[in-house]
Amino acid sequence: VYTISDAESPEKLKGISIDELTLSMVFSVNNSPFAGREGEYVTSRHLRDRLFKEIKTNVSMRLEETESPDAFIVSGRGELHLSVLIETMRREGYELQVGKPKVIMHHDETGTLQEPMEALTIDVPQEFMGAVMEGLGLRKAELTNMTEMACYLRMEFVIPARGLIVFRNQFLTDTKGNGVMNHVFAGY
């Protein structure tokens, strides 16, 4: 038996935790008037097979079948996670419709509905601070820390996951491409 730990005192490594799923989208067969013009794989069978293949290797994704055989609910870690899957499938020749992203709510032990929260860190030039703060204020973000670094500010927020949906585009516009934004799951 081979191991990477000391043979006399083997210690178990802590498992890697996977962040909670925060967004879901409905993936369905394209039934628009332009269906069948852009993709090679257009049927629900093709879509189903590809999505089930994806969840075998993508451990941070969940798939649910719906009442309709043509639609599937795909849950993932966030916008980027789901958009990478969509773009990969598009490049592989799949043609599909995608629904609006929805935040996955959670019930605590008392039955109270809770919303996923994200810890957001932003590095932005000082002259764009006002526009960024205004945009985040409208999205219910709460400033927890601000640090000055040369001509940049680092701002840390706690924000509902729904507040981050399509925020990246606004952020890049507000900072003229000079801002850096990172977020991780913070809890419910």
What are these model-predicted stretches?
Residues 1-188:
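Accessory interaction regions appended to the cores of large information-processing enzymes
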